[in-house]
Curated annotation (Swiss-Prot):
Pfam families: Apocytochr_F_C, Apocytochr_F_N
Protein name (record): Cytochrome f
Cofactor or coenzyme needed: heme
Membrane topology annotation: Single-pass membrane protein
GO biological process, one term: photosynthesis
Cofactor note: Binds 1 heme group covalently.
Gene3D superfamilies on file: 2.40.50.100, Cytochrome f large domain, Single helix bin
Record note on quaternary structure: The 4 large subunits of the cytochrome b6-f complex are cytochrome b6, subunit IV (17 kDa polypeptide, petD), cytochrome f and the Rieske protein, while the 4 small subunits are PetG, PetL, PetM and PetN. The complex functions as a dimer.
UniProt source species: Ipomoea purpurea (Common morning glory)
């Protein structure tokens, strides 16, 4: 009887431990999933400034290319692809937050005209779903469905990102018009150099905050350095903290100037922006164009037939 009770207690403890572990796993996964904030969303109501500059450039300081491809024209209530290409050398490795080297991630922001939005899953073709893969798109703001963000995602797999877009229908959306519209895109590869609060990441160069002699360099246990700079005139000391990642360029006893680089610049990524144009085409206008072309072709045919008939009449009169 005692053995049975002991077994029952052990069973309850194991069940409880599994339940707690499962809860911790779910909580941890949730926090990890939400630990990739799109920094621009936190600090800016609109990602594109009045000057045309996309705010992602505030954190990603290096300038790199980005390309966007969209159809020249689309019909109302139609799903189409906006393909964003973020090219880079796949052999490159970036400095991670812990100072180690790893693959580059990519991200993009797509600014569509008002009324254009992410296409619902039930409107996507099988081919389009394959192109999208496991990408998860989200609106920049709940009230800004025309601005889409994605990332960070692995660059080796998603250096080309396909956005599924649904065009508006002016018949149901009064604000939509049959016009030519601009589309803006921003894309980054790799980590940024500056955080939104203005502090530096470990993916950038660190400069001396004072002039003097490098009197001491301490290598930290978890990586990084503490560099003590002593002013030769008054012996005042300044300590510069270097996080893990950048390579040190100075040594003890070296004389340095203010703002002189203490480390190399480990950044291999960068940000770029571009634009394209798309026409929301009126179906009646297309039908009118087709009708006009058909009329021209028919007129040409009748003209040729009339000419041949006239030639036959002339030939008959000559023979008569």
């Amino acid at each position: 009887m005692q053995t049975r009770n002991t077994f029952s207690c052990i069973k309850k403890q194991i069940t409880r431990s599994i339940s707690v572990s499962l809860m911790l796993y779910i909580i941890t996964r949730t926090s990890i999933a939400s630990a990739y904030p799109i920094f621009a969303q936190q600090g800016f109501e609109n990602p594109r400034e009045a000057t045309g500059r996309i705010v992602c450039a505030n954190c990603h300081l290096a300038n790199k290319p980005v390309d966007i491809e969209v159809p020249q024209a689309v019909l109302p209530d139609t799903v189409f692809e906006a393909v964003v290409r973020i090219p880079y050398d796949m052999q490159l490795k970036q400095v991670l937050s812990n100072g180690k080297k790893g693959g580059l991630n990519v991200g993009a922001v797509l600014i569509l005209p008002e009324g254009f939005e992410l296409a619902p899953p039930d409107r996507l073709s099988t081919e389009m779903k394959e192109k999208i893969g496991n990408l998860s798109f989200q609106s920049y703001r709940p009230n800004k469905k025309n601005i889409l963000v994605v990332g960070p995602v692995p660059g080796k797999k998603y250096s080309e990102i396909t956005f599924p877009i649904l065009s508006p229908d002016p018949a149901t959306k009064k604000d939509a018009r049959f016009l030519k519209y601009p589309i803006y895109v921003g894309g980054n590869r790799g980590r940024g150099q500056i955080y939104p609060d203005g502090s530096k990441s470990n993916n950038t160069v660190y400069n001396a905050t004072a002039a003097g002699i490098v009197s001491k360099i301490i290598r930290k246990e978890k990586g990084g350095y503490e560099i003590t700079i002593t002013d030769a005139s008054d012996s005042r000391q300044v300590v510069d903290i270097i996080p893990p990642g950048p390579e040190l360029l100075v040594s003890e006893g070296e004389s340095i100037k203010f703002d002189q680089p203490l480390t190399s610049n480990p950044n291999v990524g960068g940000f770029g922006q571009g634009d394209a144009e798309i026409v929301l085409q009126d179906p009646l206008r297309v039908q009118g164009l087709l009708f006009f072309l058909a009329s021209v072709i028919l007129a040409q045919i009748f003209l040729v037939l009339k000419k041949k008939q006239f030639e036959k009449v002339q030939l008959a009169e000559m023979n008569f």
